[in-house]
């Protein structure tokens, strides 16, 4: 069975954020991921991890802004990354530097740098070309900085239905960027939810990309409602078998992040009651 990490931004939302660590451990998770750590004291986050025997395996670099209030405000205003946005290179670098400080303190091996949104006012090939040039340059710099402390930078294709104008949508696009940058610590965060919506053929995509060594992290959710992975059109039990099979063949050892919205998530114990899919997968 794959190794599952609880996404604390979406799971256990009936609880205050810091209490979600204990809830995840109680349900048998050994690792966690979430969007952003910046609004919380580092010592408190580390204490929650240690007290509950959890590994921090992923979080995001800031979507915009350079301090906790600015980051929260940027996310609330719809910012979804600065990596591909011309003119915001200094903001991107400051955000990555902040993320690396948190990653070092939390011993987190992976940081997801969201690509950002294409402008509404400028469309077409010229804008995409400029965005890609900035994206590659920023990621090359970020990978170099992250390598100094043994961290990996991740990029994630996200479907345009949930996130219109997001710069990166397809797996092949992400892998092309990773190959162009050429840094061994730049990898793809492959979310099977987004992959199914944009491309489908998820099992074959897993067979194609996991053996490349360019996939650093997987995420799952049911399609189309983004509930538990066994709700909707994806056959999650089969996909878990594919992951196990391919991982055994190629040595892939990554985590599978549970980035979904539980159907009963707002109810006390709702996340826990929805975890039957995990037991069936084992």
Residue ranges and their predicted role:
Residues 80-187, 197:
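Active-site acidic/histidine proton-transfer and metal-coordination neighborhood
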Residues 33, 57-60, 112, 154, ...:
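Conserved beta-strand positions in the central sheet of alpha/beta enzyme cores
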Residues 65-84:
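Active-site gating loops and adjacent loop-to-helix segments of metal-dependent hydrolytic enzymes
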């Amino acid at each position: 069975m794959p190794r599952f990490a609880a996404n604390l931004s979406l799971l256990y939302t009936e609880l205050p954020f810091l209490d979600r660590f204990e809830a995840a451990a109680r349900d048998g998770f050994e690792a966690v991921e979430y969007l952003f750590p910046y609004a919380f004291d580092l010592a408190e986050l580390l204490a929650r991890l240690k007290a509950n025997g959890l590994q921090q395996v992923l979080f995001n670099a800031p979507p915009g802004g350079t301090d906790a209030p600015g980051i929260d405000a940027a996310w609330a205003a719809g910012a979804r990354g600065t990596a591909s946005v011309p003119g915001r290179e200094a903001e991107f670098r400051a955000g990555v530097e902040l993320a690396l400080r948190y990653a070092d303190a939390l011993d987190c091996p992976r940081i997801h740098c969201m690509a950002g949104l294409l402008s509404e006012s400028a469309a077409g090939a010229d804008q995409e070309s400029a965005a890609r040039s900035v994206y590659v340059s920023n990621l090359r710099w970020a990978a170099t900085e992250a390598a100094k402390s043994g961290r990996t930078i991740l990029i994630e294709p996200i479907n345009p239905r949930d996130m219109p104008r997001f710069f990166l949508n397809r797996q092949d696009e992400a892998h092309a960027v990773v190959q162009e940058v050429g840094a061994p610590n730049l990898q793809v965060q492959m979310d099977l939810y987004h992959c199914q919506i944009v491309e489908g053929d998820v099992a074959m995509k897993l067979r194609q990309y996991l053996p490349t060594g360019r996939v650093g992290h997987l995420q799952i959710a049911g399609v189309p409602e983004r509930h538990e992975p066994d709700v909707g059109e994806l056959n999650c039990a089969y996909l878990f078998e594919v992951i196990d099979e391919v991982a055994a063949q190629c040595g892939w050892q990554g985590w599978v992040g549970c980035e979904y919205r539980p159907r009963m998530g707002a109810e006390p114990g709702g996340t826990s009651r929805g975890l039957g899919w995990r037991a069936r997968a084992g």
